[in-house]
Amino acid sequence: MKKHYPTFPFFLTLVLVGLIAACSPKIQQAPESKFNRVQNIPPDIEKWERDMLAFERQDKEKNPGKRPILFIGSSSIVGWKSLESDFPGKRLLNRGFGGSQTDEVHYYAFRILYPYKPKQVVIYVGDNDIAAGKSSETVYNDLKDLFDDIRYQLPKTKITYISIKPSPSRWHLMDEFTKTNERVKTYLESMGNASYVDVVKPMLMPNGKANPEYFLSDSLHMTPQGYSVWAEALRPHLKGRF
């Protein structure tokens, strides 16, 4: 029987494929998700079920569309009523729920985050964690777990974190806020396709104190002027042009 040997073009093709593979940029492997929803159930998590059901009703009433820029987190996200006017022309979706902490946001990510497959997720959470007595170390680790899980579940989604704000009513916690912010900033810079938005500096007066014009009478939640500061700080970090 006559043997058929590979032709020269065949070998040339193999060589070219090898060269292309060697020269192609390496994509960093996403860390495997270590979050176990069964073993990591936050206390009183059922109190948020009403919010989750409300989000599901909203999705049925109005299709959120494909790959939105998703905002998740605590009451500072919930209260951002000017979101669409601050970022016109963007497909935005707000899925914040007030009073939430990082582990609660992470627990509900399978309902408020992953189903939407956002092109970008903007996160504000951690404030309530520290106010509840958690250390900056604990909050940082919870945030890191959340970031890693997002990267594992949605490797192409940009992760953007808004720093913990300098609320006058929680000024005594600023050292812990600062420690958390600094560690989160460093971690996000190492991730790629992620960004950290500093809202502390623009919310301070020249004397280093929080500007009261940016906060409501409770000295915790923000005024429209406060949200304008946030919008200005966030705008350069959003995907797509304005």
How would you name each of these model-derived features?
Residues G96-G98, I123-I130, K134, K144, ...:
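Cell-envelope and extracellular/periplasmic
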Residues P168-F242:
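Catalytic His-Asp segment of secreted/periplasmic serine-dependent ester chemistry enzymes
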Residues K62-P64, R111, N128, K144, ...:
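Extracellular glycan-modifying ectodomains
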